[in-house]
Every structure is written in structure tokens, then in C-alpha cells.
């Protein structure tokens, strides 16, 4: 028997594996610790120290193997030690996921302590759910970390290209995103590589833990234990923001919140509620206020929407050596037979179909979930709109778009709108 094998049998530890663990921990520390000096945490050294300790304690305090004298003589106590270690490991992994995702998306750590702990609770729920599915600590950590990193990378590139975070309603827009993404290039940035490398090192360190003793061998016991934890954490994540007396401000940037918390809270607001005071009687009363004579002329109606066109001077002082839009400004200054004005839309950084919806139907996006795609989520049948009665007046209607017809579900929506 070799000396290394003899040492392993007597001590329960493989010296080569211990050396690999040390190297992994050093590499993880060099990648992870500098991230804590990003953002406001650099002004909160106490939090930085606690986070560092929290990330490394479960990795350093490894449980003994079963053939260790303590484990053999105190089986129940050792099982309790393993359980505590597993809980610490999940809490640590949740903090690591939060910091890596925030750094990947924002380039820094979120600014508010309250927002940090809200996001941390959400990630703890994710890891508890992962353990509920697989019933294995190592696989649960790797699965939870993979979910976190995938969400972080998607959010990173959505923010890069669109300027707004990914939402649950974006799932319905995957086809449109695939069409649009053909015109973009996705650079592999240092923040993504650094976060991914730290996540891999953390997972490898967890997988190399020497452990042959299980807290409980029966799979249904593990799931029965983790199920209430998931439910409690989900309840805390859902209602916690009201408990502390704050609210989610959709008009504010997601930089005020952690990415996971912002995503989940927006997802819970993705259900349409009937506006206050809305009824058929109220609509009839509003309609009765508008009277007029039936027109006899049937002019051609042409509507052009150009999402890349805007008068930048209307939102601030724009100094140029010559007027960039002389004809447009001439029309807006009272040209004969011209009615002009400025249009304010509810979309930013894309979402042109929502502006189409507001124009064609007169319905406001204010009553729909924030940042949703109404064409893809809510328009499932014919809906009254500007073109609904034109066929009875002898008009023929058509819609022309210069890009793929599958984007924003326009093929079906235009059919529902009789275009």
C-alpha cells in the first residue's frame, strides 16, 4: 500500500485533494473578495468582512469523514453537525450568487443593505428549491449556482442591448429577441468571465468536499424537510417588502434592487386587474359626451411610425450651427392646413408594438404589467381598434413593416385588428 493511500485510510483525508482544495480556495478568494469593494460596500467594511467570512466558512470548516473517531462515536451529533454545515453552505452559496450576479449586471454591488438581504432571501429560496428537486447538497449547490448564473448572463445582455432588465413577460418575446439579436454582436466581457470563473471555483470546491455520511438516506425525508423551507422563504420573499414598509417603484431603475428580487416582484405584478371605476355604464356615459355630424369625405389615411425619429431639441437645449429639421419645424410653427404636436410614448429602448397598441386601440399601457408585450401576452382574439369600422365605410386597410412579420406576434395581431 502506498504511503499516500495509508495516510488517507488513517486520517480520512486525501493529501492531494486537500492541496487542490487549498488552491481552489485561494483562487476563489482572489476572484471574489475584490468584488466586495465595488459599489457602496467599499464604504461598509463591516459588511464586506462578514460576507467574506460567510462565503468561506462552509468551505473551510469541512465535516470529518465517517471513519473519523468523532463521527463513529457520536453518530447523532455528527448528523446534526452535517445538517448545520449544509444550511451554512446554502446560505453562503446564496450570498455568492447575489454578489456575482449583481457584479455581472451592474458592475458593482447593490447600494442598500435592505435590498441586499431581500435578494439574499430570494436566492436562499432558489437553493432550497434546488435541494428539494435533487435531494443532494452538492448537486443542489451546483444547480442553484447554474440557475443564478444563467439568469445573470441573460439579464446582463438584455440590459446591454435594451437598457431594461429581463422580465417574465420576455419569455413570450423570445422569437422576437432571436430575430433582433441577429443584428447584434454579444461581446464576452471581463465581468461575465470573472463572475463565471468564481462560480465554477465555488462549485468545484463544494464538490471536492470529502463526505460519505448522509444526514438521512431516505429521499422523501429530505424533500419533506426542505419543502416547508421553500414555502416559508417564498412567502418571505413575496411579502417581505411590505413587512419592512417599502414598495417596489417600477419607474425607478432596477439598480435600486437586486436583480433576482426585481425580477420576482415584477413577475408577481404580471396580472391585469380591472381599473378602478371601469364598467360598461361608465364607458356609455363617457361616450355620450361626444357628439358630431356624420362626415361625407373619405380621405386616404396614412400613419407612419418611425421609432428612430425624434426632435432632441424638445427635451433640452440643443445648440447646432443649422436647423437639423427645418421642414418639420416649419410645419410645427403653424404651416397652413397643418395640425401638429408632440407625442409622448410609454416605451423606452424598444417595445414599438406597445406604441402601436396605444395608437390603434386608445388603451394605455398604464393598466398593463410593467414592461410587458401586450401583442404577445394579451391580444388573443379580435379587439376593437381604429381600423375596426373602416371596412364598413369602403376602406381597405393594410399594414407594412420593414422587418420580419413574426416579431411581436404582428402576423396574428394584425389579423385580429383586420389589417
Tell me what each language-model feature is:
Residues 240-419:
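Soluble catalytic regions of membrane-associated enzymes that act on cell-envelope
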Residues 1-2, 307:
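PLP-dependent class I/II
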Residues 2-254:
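Transmembrane and membrane-interface helices of multi-pass
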